[in-house]
C-alpha cells in the first residue's frame, strides 16, 4: 500500500486467515518499496511477551523476527509485493504499524523540479523565444488546456479505472526489468512467483519507459503514472493544434480543434474512467496521422516523415489503434489514388512506410515470434462473437448525461449502466458547423477542390459514426464476408 499511495506511516487491522507450522497467518499482504522501516505490533490483552512474531514473503524469506510487544526494524533491498505477518499460534495479533525510517519517495523534489522547469519554459517562450507574441500566447493556451484536462489527477490518489491496475503492473514490471539488466524489457521477472510474465512481447510499451524510469529514481507509482498522463494531455493539445493548423492553414481553427479534441469525452473516459492507457496514448497521434496523409496527398510531399513518425508512435501505443489507422489510411489513399500518383508523391509514401517499419522492428519481431510459437488464448477466440450486440445506440453518440463509471453493455440493457459513448457537446457542435459550411459552399458554387480533403474527412467521420452503431450490419458481415471476421 505504501508503494501505491506514497504514505510514510500506515496502520493495518490484522485478521487471522489460517495456520502454518504452529504460526497464525494474518492479512493483509503488505507491499513495500526498498527502504528501512520501523515495525510495531498490537496484541489482544491476553497475549504475553514471549510469543514470536515474523514478517516474511511468500517464498519464506524472513525480514523480521521478534517477541510479542517488541518493536523492530526491517530493511528491504528491493520492492516486496506481498509481506505476510505470522505469530505464534497462541498469540492474537490485532494491529501492525509500519513507518518509514526516513523518506520513501522523492516526489516532492521531482514535482518542485517540474514546476521550476515549467516556469522557466513559460518565461522563455514569453520573453526570449522566437516568433511573435501570438505564438507565445498560443503555447500558453495549449499548456493551460493540457493542464485543465488533467484536473482529475490533482488528488493524492488515483481514480479507479477498469484497466488501471494492469498498467501500474506494467510500469513496475518494466522498472524491475531495467533494474535486473534487461533492455528492452521482454519479461517481468518478479511476476508469477519469480517465473516471469512476458507482457512486453505483446503490448507496445515505449511510452511506459517514462514512468518506469521515474520509478527507478525514487518516484512513487502514483506520481509516475500521473506524470505520464499530464504529459499525454499536453502533447495531445500541441499535436492536435499543429495538425489542424497544418491542414486548415488557420491558427484559429487549430486552437478550436485542439480544445475540442483535448477535452473530448471519449479521451477523458479512456484516461480516467476505463484506465485504457494504450488507447489514450494512441489518441495523441490520430491528428498527426491525418496531417501526415494530407501532406502525402496534397501538401508538402517532402514532409513524409510526419506520417512515418505518427505511425511509429501509434504502433508503440496501441495495436488496435494502429490497425484501425492503417485501414483508414488505405481508404484515403485509394480515394485519392490519382493525387498519390502525381509529382512523385507515392515515393514519399514508400519512404514513410519503410522508415516506420524499420523503427518498429524491435517490437514486431518478438511479437510475431511469440504469437506463432506460443499456445495463446486469443487463437481460440470465438469467431461468432456478437459485435452488433455491443455496438452503440445512436442516441448515445449525442448523449450528454451518463455515468462515467459504467461499462459497455448489451443492447438488451438499453442505456442501463452504459459507459459514455458520446462525442461530447464540442464535437457535436463542430460536426453541425462543418455540415453547414459544406452545404453553404455548395450553394455558393465554390469549387470542391478548395476543401476536398476536409470534405473527405467529414464524410469519413459520418461513416465511422454510423459504423459504431447497431444500425450497421456487423452480424451480416460476420456471417457472409470472411475478412470481416478478422
Describe the residue ranges of each PLM region.
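Periplasmic/ER-lumenal interhelical loops and adjacent helix-loop junctions
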Residues: 348, 353-440, 453
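Membrane-interface transmembrane helices that cradle and orient dolichyl/undecaprenyl
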Residues: 289-305, 314
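Glycan-recognition and processing domains
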Residues: 1-36, 47, 56-57, 97-99, ...
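Active-site lumenal/periplasmic loops and adjacent helix-entry segments of GT-C-fold
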Residues: 146-285, 292, 313-314, 319-320
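Start-transfer (signal-anchor) and selected internal transmembrane alpha helices
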Residues: 104-152
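Membrane-interface helix-loop-helix junctions at transmembrane boundaries of multi-pass membrane enzymes
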Residues: 130-133, 252, 339-349, 432-474
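Membrane-helix boundary/interfacial segments in multi-pass membrane proteins
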Residues: 160-165, 170, 175, 193-195, ...
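Transmembrane-embedded, aromatic-rich helix segments that form part
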Residues: 305-308, 321-336, 367
Amino acid at each position: 500500500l505504501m508503494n501505491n499511495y506514497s504514505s510514510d506511516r500506515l496502520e493495518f487491522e490484522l485478521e487471522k486467515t489460517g495456520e502454518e507450522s504452529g504460526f497464525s497467518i494474518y492479512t493483509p499482504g503488505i507491499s513495500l518499496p526498498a527502504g528501512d522501516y520501523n515495525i510495531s505490533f498490537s496484541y489482544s490483552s491476553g497475549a504475553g511477551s514471549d510469543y514470536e512474531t515474523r514478517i516474511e514473503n511468500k517464498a519464506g524469506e524472513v525480514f523480521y523476527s521478534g517477541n510479542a510487544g517488541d518493536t523492530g526494524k526491517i530493511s528491504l533491498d528491493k520492492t516486496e509485493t506481498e509481506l505476510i505477518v505470522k505469530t505464534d499460534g497462541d498469540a492474537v495479533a490485532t494491529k501492525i504499524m509500519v513507518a518509514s525510517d526516513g523518506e520513501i519517495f522523492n516526489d516532492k523534489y521531482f514535482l518542485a523540479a517540474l514546476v521550476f522547469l515549467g516556469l522557466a519554459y513559460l518565461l522563455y517562450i514569453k520573453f526570449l523565444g522566437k516568433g511573435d507574441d501570438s505564438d507565445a500566447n498560443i503555447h500558453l493556451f495549449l499548456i493551460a488546456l493540457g493542464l485543465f484536462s488533467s484536473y482529475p489527477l490533482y488528488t493524492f490518489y488515483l481514480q479507479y479505472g477498469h484497466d488501471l491496475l494492469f498498467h501500474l503492473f506494467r510500469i513496475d514490471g518494466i522498472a524491475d526489468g531495467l533494474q535486473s539488466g534487461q533492455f528492452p524489457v521482454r519479461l517481468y521477472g518478479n511476476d508469477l512467483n519469480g517465473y516471469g510474465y512476458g507482457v512486453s512481447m505483446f503490448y507496445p510499451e515505449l511510452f511506459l519507459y517514462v514512468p518506469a524510469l521515474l520509478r527507478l529514481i525514487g518516484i512513487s507509482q502514483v506520481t509516475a503514472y500521473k506524470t505520464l498522463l499530464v504529459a499525454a494531455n499536453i502533447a495531445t493539445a500541441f499535436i492536435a493544434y499543429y495538425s489542424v493548423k497544418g491542414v486548415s492553414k488557420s491558427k484559429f481553427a487549430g486552437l478550436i480543434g485542439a480544445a475540442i479534441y483535448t477535452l473530448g469525452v471519449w479521451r477523458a473516459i479512456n484516461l480516467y474512467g476505463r484506465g485504457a492507457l494504450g488507447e489514450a496514448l494512441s489518441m495523441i497521434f490520430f491528428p498527426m496521422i491525418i496531417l501526415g496523409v494530407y501532406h502525402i496527398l496534397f501538401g508538402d510531399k517532402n514532409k513524409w516523415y510526419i506520417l512515418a513518425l505518427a505511425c511509429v508512435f501509434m504502433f508503440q501505443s496501441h495495436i488496435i489503434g494502429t490497425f484501425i489507422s492503417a485501414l483508414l489510411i488505405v481508404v484515403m489513399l485509394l480515394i485519392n489514388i490519382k493525387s498519390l500518383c502525381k509529382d512523385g508523391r507515392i515515393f514519399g509514401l514508400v519512404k514513410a512506410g519503410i522508415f516506420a517499419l524499420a523503427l518498429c522492428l524491435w517490437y514486431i519481431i518478438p511479437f510475431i515470434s511469440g504469437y506463432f510459437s506460443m499456445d495463446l488464448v486469443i487463437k481460440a477466440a470465438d469467431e461468432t462473437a456478437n459485435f452488433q450486440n455491443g455496438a452503440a445506440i445512436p442516441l448515445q453518440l449525442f448523449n450528454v448525461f451518463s455515468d462515467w463509471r459504467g461499462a459497455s453493455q448489451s443492447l438488451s440493457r438499453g442505456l442501463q449502466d452504459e459507459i459514455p459513448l458520446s462525442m461530447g457537446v464540442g464535437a457535436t457542435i463542430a460536426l453541425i458547423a462543418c455540415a453547414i459550411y459544406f452545404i453553404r459552399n455548395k450553394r455558393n458554387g465554390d469549387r470542391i477542390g478548395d476543401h476536398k480533403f476536409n470534405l473527405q474527412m467529414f464524410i469519413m467521420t459520418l461513416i465511422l459514426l454510423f459504423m459504431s452503431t447497431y444500425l450497421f450490419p456487423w452480424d451480416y458481415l460476420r456471417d457472409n464476408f470472411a475478412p470481416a471476421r478478422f
